[in-house]
């Protein structure tokens, strides 16, 4: 059975659509878990997805005896544009040492427990709320973060006409402690007086020979900076 998008076998709609977990070999199912903390809303968001063979393969709904829980509570099923996923969301104050557990039972009766932990909040060293930035020269933003986390920093500007946002983002891969916005890119910000500075720490890992993927994200509350 191929993971390509033209597949129509074993009850699967297509490798780009949605199918049922009981219709595939359980050893071919890719498990993908995401744990995200949104600091501004104090919300924990967990999601789980299951795909045939790889992340581009058929999105699978857990059917038959298969099930998924987060923190011992069943996750809610949703299907958006033929993509099946399971979600859980609730309010909680962030605590550094908290552990979270996804528990998945496949159709062969095997149970997998996957621990996840929210990354620590990156600490900005060169900017703070109310800082002013100059757009006629390169802008280096330094931070302190766990060296296993990648950190993405965005400058976001709200459109005055329709309320949408534009973002200019730079990512520091794990081990780096700064990002640089070049003056050429910053020149596009001349139309705004204030910007939101958004910071996100992310760690990713692959487990069990690539059959399990885990993403853990801390989304810091944005701060205002001025031009």
Residue ranges and their predicted role:
Residues 123-185:
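Short helix-loop boundary/capping segments
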Residues 12-15:
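C-terminal motif of bacterial Sec signal peptides marking the signal peptidase cleavage site
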Residues 1-5:
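Bacterial N-terminal signal peptides that target proteins for export
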Residues 114, 118-126:
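A eukaryotic nuclear recognition-module signature that targets compact all-alpha binding cores
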Residues 17-117, 184-227:
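Ser/Thr/Pro- and often Gln-rich low-complexity regulatory segments
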